[in-house]
C-alpha cells in the first residue's frame, strides 16, 4: 500500500496495490501494521460507518470537539470529493484544507486524524462511503462548520447547489467554530 502525505502532512492518502485478472480483482484494504507505520503512531479503530448518498449530496463539515475522531475514509461505490480541514489552533496548517477524489475505481482511502473537520460531496449518481473511526459517535460533542465558509474557501467541484441536511445548513462559520488547542 502506497502512503502519501498531502499538503497538510498529517492527512495521508493510501493507494492499495490491486491484483486483477479476468476473474476480477483483489486488494488489501487495511493492514494495521502498514497503516500505523505510515501514521507514525498506534491507531485503534472502534467503529465502522457506512452511508449511501445521491449525486450532489454534501455531508459536512463534521467533527467532535470531545471524543475527537480520527477517520479512515473511502468510497466503495461511486465517487466523492473528500475534504479535511485542520482545526488545531497550534498547527502551522490551522484553517487550511485538503481535498481528494475517492472512488470505487481508484480505491484510495484518506486518513483524517482527530482535530480535523471532515466532509464530502457525491460526484457520481450514487456513492457508498465507508469509514473507520477512532472514537465512538458522541452527538452531544458533534459540531458542524458550514460547507461554503468564506474564510475556508473550499473549492468544491459542484455544478449546482448541494443537497444538505438541516444540520449541515445550520453549520457555524469557521470564525465562530469550537476548535482544538
Curated annotation (Swiss-Prot):
Q: What does this protein do?
A: Catalyzes the epimerization of the C3' and C5'positions of dTDP-6-deoxy-D-xylo-4-hexulose, forming dTDP-6-deoxy-L-lyxo-4-hexulose.
What are the UniProt keywords, alphabetically?
Carbohydrate metabolism, Isomerase, Lipopolysaccharide biosynthesis
Name of the featured protein: dTDP-4-dehydrorhamnose 3,5-epimerase
Which GO molecular function terms does the record list?
dTDP-4-dehydrorhamnose 3,5-epimerase activity
- Site description Participates in a stacking interaction with the thymidine ring of dTDP-4-oxo-6-deoxyglucose, residues in chain: 137
Q: Which residues form the active site?
A: 62, 131
* Catalysed reactions, semicolon-separated: dTDP-4-dehydro-6-deoxy-alpha-D-glucose = dTDP-4-dehydro-beta-L-rhamnose
Give the highest taxon in the source lineage.
Bacteria
A Gene Ontology CC term for this entry?
cytosol
Q: Per the UniProt record, which EC number(s) apply here?
A: 5.1.3.13
Q: Which species is the source of this protein?
A: Pseudomonas aeruginosa (strain ATCC 15692 / DSM 22644 / CIP 104116 / JCM 14847 / LMG 12228 / 1C / PRS 101 / PAO1)
Q: Which residues bind substrate?
A: 23, 28, 47-49, 59, 71, 118, 142, 167
Give the metabolic or biological pathway: Carbohydrate biosynthesis; dTDP-L-rhamnose biosynthesis; Bacterial outer membrane biogenesis; lipopolysaccharide biosynthesis
Say which family it is in.
Answer: Belongs to the dTDP-4-dehydrorhamnose 3,5-epimerase family.
GO biological-process terms attached to the record: dTDP-rhamnose biosynthetic process; lipopolysaccharide biosynthetic process; lipopolysaccharide core region biosynthetic process; polysaccharide biosynthetic process
**Which positions, given as ranges, span the membrane?**
none
- What Pfam families does the database record attribute to this sequence? dTDP_sugar_isom
Amino acid at each position: 500500500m502506497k502512503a502519501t502525505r498531502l499538503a497538510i502532512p498529517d492527512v495521508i492518502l493510501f493507494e492499495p496495490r490491486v491484483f486483477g485478472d479476468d476473474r476480477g480483482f483483489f486488494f488489501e484494504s487495511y493492514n494495521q501494521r502498514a497503516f500505523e507505520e505510515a501514521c507514525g503512531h498506534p491507531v485503534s479503530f472502534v467503529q465502522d460507518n457506512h452511508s449511501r448518498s445521491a449525486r450532489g449530496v454534501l455531508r459536512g463539515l463534521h467533527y467532535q470537539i470531545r471524543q475527537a475522531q480520527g477517520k479512515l475514509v473511502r468510497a466503495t461505490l461511486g465517487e466523492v470529493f473528500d475534504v479535511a480541514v485542520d482545526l488545531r489552533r497550534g498547527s502551522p496548517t490551522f484553517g487550511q484544507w485538503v481535498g481528494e477524489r475517492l472512488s470505487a475505481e481508484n480505491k484510495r482511502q484518506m486518513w483524517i486524524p482527530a482535530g480535523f473537520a471532515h466532509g464530502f460531496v457525491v460526484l457520481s449518481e450514487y456513492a457508498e462511503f465507508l469509514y473507520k473511526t477512532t472514537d465512538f459517535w458522541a452527538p452531544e460533542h458533534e459540531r458542524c462548520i458550514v460547507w461554503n465558509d468564506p474564510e475556508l474557501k473550499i473549492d468544491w467541484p459542484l455544478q449546482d447547489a448541494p443537497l444538505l441536511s438541516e444540520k449541515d445548513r445550520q453549520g457555524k462559520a469557521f470564525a465562530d467554530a469550537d476548535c482544538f488547542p
